[in-house]
Amino acid sequence: MQTEAMVLERHGGPEVLEKRTIDLPPPGPHEVRVRVHAVAMNHMDLWVRRGGPAFKLEYPHRLGCDIAGTVEELGARARGVLPGDRVMIQPGLSCGICKACLSGHDNLCRRYRILGENAQGGYTRHLNVPDENVIRVGDKLSFAEAAALPLCTLTAWQMVFRKAQVKPGQTVVVHAAGSGVSSIVIQLCKLVGAKVIATTGSPDKAERARAIGADDVILTSEQDYVSEVKRFTGKAGADVIFDHVGGELFERALTAVAWGGRIVTCGATAAFLAKVDLRQVFFRQVEILGSTMGSKGDLLEALPLLLDGRIKAKVDRVVPLWQAREAHEALENRTVFGKVVLSVD
């Protein structure tokens, strides 16, 4: 069949995104065809579009890893869903047979791929995906809300529970409160019973961070980051710091974290390189933990919290897919709090 999509044929700015008619084969034996209704944006969309040595794309390439829609057709041996089901898509693809996959750590699979990054993504009306990646959500979430949750929830769940192992009463710092991942991290940490300090450069985003549970907000455009963390913690420093900014802010986190504390990093939206004074690490026994995505099981474990509203998607705006260029510009300009969602009419 043919369907419409936003694709790129080369790396570059938002202008490389073009609306095209593409061919889509029938779903494979263990695949499901989904009619896409919403696809949420991530910084990954910007990185892949801009290009770099890590991205080897098959053109025309479709961005978009966070997808929600309805099941249209099943492959011959597909199971778990039925035509008409409202679903979200788990964005991580793995081999399913290696030691990591079989032990429930599929995001450590050496053949791991992410929709929209190194596999064709959801900037399209229709998409074929493995049946094991399709999760029914019923009618408790809008398509925009369902699309806004998968990658952020996976990432936040692994950071909070698998890596940092946040406990009641601990003080945590969450960088870049306006991001989708950070908004989920804040909510999860509050559910655990932790005290949350968020950072942002915008007074408007500071108020929104408080609205979703942050106990204090450091306005990095006006306040000294380390001094404010020390003030809030009685000079002890934060038990856990969650970072996906990188660069200078990561460097300063090494001074703001408590003795024996943990820094969990899942990205570097500002800068990939940071200078690390190893004395701060070994002498103060600071743990630096890397984190990418989460397992399929993590999303299923988080699902009840998503469906009953204890964890809410923060959707800043909904934009038609065919206006993806404008949506990319908004995300690049950092004028959003939470997620930009592309609707597919």
Where are the predicted features?
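Glycine-rich beta-strand-centered segment in the early N-terminal region that forms part
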Residues: 23-39, 52-102, 138-140
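Short glycine-centered segments of the SAM/dcSAM-binding site in methyltransferase folds
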Residues: 86, 171, 195, 261-262, ...
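Rossmann-fold dehydrogenase core element
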Residues: 259-266, 275-315
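Glycine-rich cofactor phosphate-binding loops and adjacent beta1-alpha1 units
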Residues: 197-203, 207-285
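C-terminal hydrophobic helical "lid"/dimerization subdomain
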Residues: 1, 9, 296-345
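Mid-domain Rossmann-like dinucleotide-binding core that forms the NAD(H)/NADP(H) cofactor-binding site
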Residues: 141-223
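Cysteine-cluster motifs in flexible loop/terminal segments that predominantly coordinate metals
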Residues: 93-126, 130-131
